[in-house]
Amino acid sequence: MVRICLDCFVEKGLTVATTKDLCKAAKLQNGGIYYYFSTKEEIVLACAEEAISRIEKGAFAIVLEDIRDIKSMMDHLGELADKMSPTMRFLVSVCVSREYGEKVKPSLARLAARYPYYTGRIAEILGCTDKEVAPFVHLSILAINNYMIFAERALFDPQIEAVKKELSRLAERKGRNNR
């Protein structure tokens, strides 16, 4: 149900999608959505959590699969950013909303708390320390987030090129980069 609602919010927008739209998308009678959720706020926050999950799983699946070929990994992350841009924009609209902004912060904090795990996995694969790779993990996250929000390559390419260069250098130092 959450996935259907998120797709509806992504398509129509946070402020435009009505509970009637959500019911229609879920093939429910008007008001039927409240069988699954108590309030619209509960729906929005569940959808924000799902948006975070989609973006996180998509991005880190690519990273952990392609990290040995850094150029390919960054290309795939750019493609994912193009695809996930509408989802990120929905998430941003929730985060900046007066109604939901404070309430979504715990979900964002849980996401940020998972970054050290990903940093550790990337460092392990590349054969370097967490401390060496952490700045580039965070710069990549920032660049991809900015690109998904603003859909402007000029904000993305310079940061990603810097990350590619430095991650490749780290990987080559350990003989772990295929490119």
Task: Specify the residue positions occupied by each region the protein language model found.
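Amphipathic alpha-helical packing segments from all-alpha helical-bundle domains
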Residues: E56, F60-A61, K83-P86, Y100-G127, ...
